[in-house]
C-alpha cells in the first residue's frame, strides 16, 4: 500500500524543556477508581468547585513545610522569580483554575468547557498533615479519603454553597505533593508523610467506605459529592545538592490538567508501579508530559487521548494511492482534518498527526506576572 501525504509542516518535534530535571518519575497512579464513560463528561460544560485547605501547624520533619499556606520558607526567601511563587492565596489558585480552563477549552477546540468557582475561605482541618498521609508505598488511601470527607463536611457546615450546581470538586491543600520518586532522584525520601495527589472516583471511595457508599452528603443530604481531585499548592521542594540545598522547581499546572483528564476518564499512560514513561512528552497522561517544562506547560493531549475523549474524528484511510494534506494540529484550523487513522487489523490501528511547537514560525512571547 502506498500512502502519499503532504505535510504542510514536516518536522515532528517533541516538546522540550528548559532546564528540565532529569529522572523525574511520578510515583503512583493519578486515579483511584475505575474509568468513567468518557462521553458523559468529556464533552460540554463541567462546573468545578474548588476549596483551599490547610492543616494544624506542625514541626514534623516527615512533611514539607508547617502544614499551613505560607509555611514553605524556601519559597518565601526566593521571591517571585521562580515557578509558582508565593503567595499561595485566592489569586494564585484562581490562576491555576484559569490555566485549567484555557488548556481544555483550547485543546478540545471548544468541545470541553469549564466554569469554576473557588471559595475565598481557607479551611483549617482538625489534624496535622501527617495524620492524613497514606503509609509509604501503600495503596491504602483511607486517611486521605477521610481528609476529603472532613473537608466537605467542614465546607458544608460553615459556608452557604449549593453543591448541586457543580460536577467536579477540587481540594487545593497546603504543602508539597508526595508525587515524585525522591529515592530515585536523590537516594532518600525526606518527606514520607506528604500527601499524594489523587483523583478519587465514586468506586474508589466505595473501596474505603463500603459498597453502599454513594458520596458525601451535603446540603442536608440533598446532594452527594462523588469525586474529588486532591492537589498540592506546589510540587517545588528543596533537595540536597553538591554544596548545599537546591530548589527543584516543578509547577502544578500539568498535574492539575492530568488530574482533570483522569476525572474525564483518561487512563494513566505511564507505568504506575515504576513511574517509567509510556507515551513520553507527546501526551498529557504521562509524567514526562504533565511535568514538561518543569510542570508549567503540559503538551496538548495526544491523538489517541483526543480520540478517546471524543474530541477528534479522524480521516480513515480506505484505499491506496491516497493523497492527504495534514496540517499541524496546533494550528487548530480544522481539527477533524488533522488526524489520520490507518487500520492494521480489526483491533489495531495507527494514528498519524503533525505535531508542531511553533507552526506559524512566529515564536511565543511569555509574560509572567
For each predicted feature, which ranges?
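Zymogen propeptides/activation segments of proteases
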Residues: 3-7, 16-211, 336, 341-369
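Extracellular hydrolytic enzyme modules, especially secreted metalloproteases
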Residues: 168-170, 174-368
